[in-house]
Amino acid sequence: MAHSLRKTRKLRGHVSHGHGRIGKHRKHPGGRGNAGGQHHHRINRDKYHPGYFGKVGMRVFHLNKNHHYCPTVNVDRLWALVPEEQKTKVSAEKAPVIDCVKAGYFKVLGKGLLPKQPLIVKAKFFSHEAENKIKAAGGACILVA
């Protein structure tokens, strides 16, 4: 539908002319876009975008990480990982559970002898010999991620 009057004609006599009282149709008093981020808009940046400005340290690019980290424990040391109070409660039916990963060992190796007491061993890796010795004593090997 066509109008007989343009908006400017309609707004004649209204002081603010449709641009509000406060800003009074002034351009960009705070600057355009991200202007003043380190100056007059600093509080906003610090509150809502912490860490936006400033330097970032260097990555230690020459640090050689050991990707083959795998501490080992032998079969003859497994009983040393069982707490003393648990050793007294051990019976033929109830085997103690040894978590090698919690003790700081990833792999169980087969050196040494095991007593004829069954035990349940949790580790990331087992050598064949260690697995055979633990199973021969009536125990079990459980792989843990």
UniProtKB/Swiss-Prot annotation:
GO terms (BP aspect): translation
Record GO terms (molecular function): structural constituent of ribosome
Keywords: Cytoplasm, Endoplasmic reticulum, Ribonucleoprotein, Ribosomal protein
Assembly mode: Component of the large ribosomal subunit.
GO annotations of cellular component type: cytoplasmic side of rough endoplasmic reticulum membrane; cytosolic large ribosomal subunit; large ribosomal subunit
A Pfam family assignment: Ribosomal_L27A
InterPro entries membership: Ribosomal_uL15, Ribosomal_uL15/eL18, Ribosomal_uL15/eL18_sf, Ribosomal_uL15_CS
Protein's name according to its UniProt entry: Large ribosomal subunit protein uL15
Role: Component of the large ribosomal subunit.
Keyword Cytoplasm belongs to the record: yes
Main location (coarse class): cytoplasm
Subcellular location: Cytoplasm, Cytosol; Cytoplasm; Rough endoplasmic reticulum
